[in-house]
Amino acid sequence: MGNLFFYYFIQKIIMRCFIVSLLLLFCIGCTSNSGALFIKKTSDHTGIGFINKLTYTEEFNPYTYRNFYNGAGVAVGDVNNDGLLDLFFTGNIVGNKLYLNQGNFKFKDITVSAGVGCEEVWSSGSTFVDLNHDGFLDLYVCKSGKPGGAHRNNELFINNGDLTFTESSKAYGLDIIGLSVQAAFFDADRDGDL
């Protein structure tokens, strides 16, 4: 009986020492400064200067448009098949922007040359998708909000493969004039098309 108590007592001491040792190792590991998990990159370094700034006016504000703060979207995809992810930002009151990834967290604004800019129409969500199955990502942009009125149709930019796009929403029957927020594409009947 005495030996059993002794082994039980020793086992508890060993277990407590083990737990305390693990906690000490954990605390020491947490205090060592082995480098930052994230490094802040400025717009001067990245080349990304997009700001979706919302400005009130007497005619257009959260009281006259209830979805004023619904936000905008970001699409991430490789538009030129170079293995680097490019960025497309939609703007509500400001214009949309397409940034080509040049590597090492440096991007180039190619909005105008690519033909995907949109001014004065409230853009919300955006989706990169290879809609015509040519191996290049196309871009679908949803429109919402008050600005633009009847001209507020969603846009489909077909990738020409040379860093330019052609707006083709009407040809594909996707020039919707609703209050679209986001679009998702999938092959519902598994026939190979979206």
Q: Where are the predicted features?
A:
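Short intrinsically disordered, low-complexity coil segments enriched in acidic
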Residues: 1-5, 191-193
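Carboxylate-rich, polar loop motifs that coordinate divalent cations or form catalytic acidic clusters
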Residues: 3-9, 36, 98
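Low-complexity intrinsically disordered segments
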Residues: 7-12, 25
